[in-house]
Amino acid sequence: MAAVILAVAICVALVSAPLAAQEKVEEVRPPKLNYTTHKLANGLEVILLEDHAVPIINLQVWYHVGSKDEPPGHTGFAHLFEHLMFKGSAHVAAEEHSRIIESVGGFDNAETNDDTTNFFETFPSNYLERLLWLEADRMGSLNVSEANFKSEREVVKEERRVRVENQPYGYLQEDLRAAAFTVHGYHHTPIGSMEDLDKATIQDVRDFFNTYYKPNNATLVIVGDFESAQALAWTKKYFDGIPASAKPIPRLDNPEPPQTAERVVKKSYSNTPLPAVVIGYKIPARYAPDAYPLDLASNILAGGESSRLYQTLVYKEQIAVQAAGFGAFSEDPNLFWAYAIMNQGHTAEEGEKALVEVLDGLKTAPVDAKELEKAKNQEISGFVLGRDTDQEKAEALASAAVIGKNPALANTELGHYLTISPDDIQRVAKEYFALQHATVLIVTPAAPAQ
């Protein structure tokens, strides 16, 4: 814990003093995660990291199935199972999983993304055996009943109405992704479509569970106050009896073809008060070498109100009320998003031109040392503060293991950022921020109904 406090103190000092020498920045490292890995006979990957600072444990199960694995006509299934996994199993009643955790002072949650579906819980360390039993029970005997399926389908549909259909600019992500990806599963979002959810059958849903929710498609991570030998023994006790899938886990063979020309899509939304523009540039996968300088470039371009996009479009030119961006770094190549919501009297086309000019600025001149060091300091801050809790450590290990195929990446990733030079930023900007690799979504408010 003292090492963490010291690292955080150094990190804060660096962020507040961006003119510090570069060699000082490169000395900073978060504490190493001294984990062990194990593989059960049924293929379950197990990662253990002891941390005896407090009597708490974070346990996570990541299933290597996300929305990109959904075949056409079955969108939303991965997210649906995020909900169904709480509806009971052979020995646990519906919603009882969470109630048991809450009754001992813990908490749990889940999330679905393009690549994975993740379940996580934090609880007092003396309940580890019970929690392993709970996770094994729903992995091996989930109650995928007609009643559960229909009730959770309605919950998911309502979530879609709230998050997408009734939200200003709620369709931006769906429309840009649909245009940017013609073949790959990133074409659609995890929430799925109403049409696919409505036509889904109970057999479709059971087939999806029986295909992907298997121990040989899962990674179990335990971080906190436990003894590894005992934790591994309990894991084998409760998970060994769950059979692996009889066939290899299917993966859609749908790589996105190279994009060689700009695509422009124009949409009008009735619940959109102001014009907007979104540009999606194709970028490499999460742990690819070029992902690191692109991530720093994303910070320089869109890392808060001091970033180039906000300062130019909102503060100086005042043509937009919001301007930002982010890199969607995923298991497969995805998109860097740059977007602007325009001010009154300004068009989305103006916004597109301004966004492109700001991104082109990274191509024409290397970033100066001060700006690059600030971005690196923010990266260090994120890494150090992002290892402060057992949950954050578990997430780092799980992501590296499932998405990066190597948990050791959790310990080596920061080093990639610290060696990035201004020339590296300029090189990746030239290669990836090119309009022939971009999809542009132009949004205008729909005319009021007469």
Question: Whereabouts are the PLM-identified features?
Answer:
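A common structural junction motif
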Residues: 136-146, 238-246, 317, 356-367
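Non-catalytic, conformational "gating/processing" segments within enzyme and secreted inhibitor domains
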Residues: 153, 206-238, 437-438
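Short pre-active-site segment immediately N-terminal to the catalytic Zn-binding motif
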Residues: 66-74
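Non-catalytic beta-strand/loop surface segments
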Residues: 20-60, 65-67, 92-127, 163-217, ...
